[in-house]
């Protein structure tokens, strides 16, 4: 496991990065290796029986919310969108054939059979995959390219997270216009109200209502399956669409126009990335069982049912999903669809929280407030800043685009762009992690990329129709993350140069016999081999040291979780000094007071390291950054980095330090 910088230097306002990955010089005292000896988490036996069924139902509520609500708008876009085709019998069979094979190839073959095998200690997703392949890259250019690729993929996921709640809830509420055309004007206001309540509810957490997400989606999939079977029974000839020849003849018959329809077909596989990203929550087997056992059959039946309806009534293309339902079941279907859309939205919102937490720990995002909303579930978190940004963007989309059909034009680019990034990173896994030969890895990569690129190109033509939004959102997020990374790296070098090797400092303390005062002083440092500048400033200005001085380093690693027995290394340095190095994965949030309180139980560094909270003072540095320094970073990036640093959550809050026990010392740094 390769070490990475900790999440923004703990000794700063939120600007300074960790320099732990930078050697402290040949004379530095060797710190315990943060990467040596780490073992894989204990492997649990694959779930079976009731446990497997429970996990599979849970996966329905989290993993399949996005792809599960696609029937609300997918075929409507294929036949009624700006690039849709006329719903003739041949076109209906052709589009349904493309739908079936897209689901089979992309979701079942690509993600289920291959991509989900590339896990980072059980975790999946763009950033986890980027961290996994980054360990094998030895060249600076190669690591930089992988970093840029992964960050852009993550940025696209944020665009996906903004669009999904808007399009899912809009698509569900639009059923009201089918049931009562006079109520069409109420669709947008009703959608806004639902989304406002959804984002306001986030601070309460999902611990209580999360248990019903799975059953809600179970009812949803059962409902769409029944509706689909009802449609198929009216015209079983739609089953001919399962033959790939209808898809091929569709392209031959419609040419370029037929190719553009892929921009609508791709909507049936939106959410495929969620299967991989949420792998750590449920495991591979429950996700596969839920897909093959219920989600895919239900979706396929519903799409075929909509197709059968279009064979019988081409005019139903204006909203084939709701027109598939009998009149008496329309309002119950709208209610179930709205509930499913809320569940799908919640899954994407929670995914954005998790992605941001990973980005912070991996050093690609400033610190933000992270609140744990459940004492039992470690992954249930709430990020207020992210929540309000997502909520504002979602409401703006609904008010700006007005209909799910218009939003569909914006949706595809984010999804297909992420798919391409995943394929490129997965190729590196096959070659570097699994050791596959070129002749074995390249054909699979080319096959995946051909399909991904076809979907992407079919969506690029929608740039003016709304495709610009996810690109703009991704470009903004990418700029912020890359700027933060570059700024942190530059600042890390400056802080390292301003520090002092630990062994030289310890020798100087022993020689000078500095006056000591009662109590414990804790200094946060990102470099285990060096002395933090704040300690040097404290000694220079105050001329005293506490009787116990603890140097704490928080090191983040490119794995999701660290085993508890390997969490902490501690040692006594002499002269009342102790060093504590704590290891965290990118899915974990450090709590320094709790960590120090646990040291006696861990039997590390002896009984002398017992921390008494009311006798302990935490010293942090607060740097004022200026943009007129020698760094080669462009001035506009320096200024952006400084703004981000000023608005980042304070180190004391992020690491859980008691505010009344924190002393901050200022310094000015020219970046």
UniProtKB/Swiss-Prot annotation:
The organism's place on the tree of life at top rank: Bacteria
Subcellular location field: Cell inner membrane
GO molecular function, one term: potassium ion transmembrane transporter activity
Keyword Cell membrane: yes
Transmembrane segments: 52-72, 92-112, 147-167, 181-201, 209-229, 255-275, 291-311, 323-343, 381-401, 407-427, 441-461, 465-485
Pfam families assigned: K_trans, K_trans_C
GO CC annotation: plasma membrane
Bilayer disposition of the protein: Multi-pass membrane protein
Protein name from the UniProt record: Probable potassium transport system protein Kup
Source species: Anaeromyxobacter dehalogenans (strain 2CP-1 / ATCC BAA-258)
Native organism taxonomy: Bacteria, Pseudomonadati, Myxococcota, Myxococcia, Myxococcales
Gene: kup
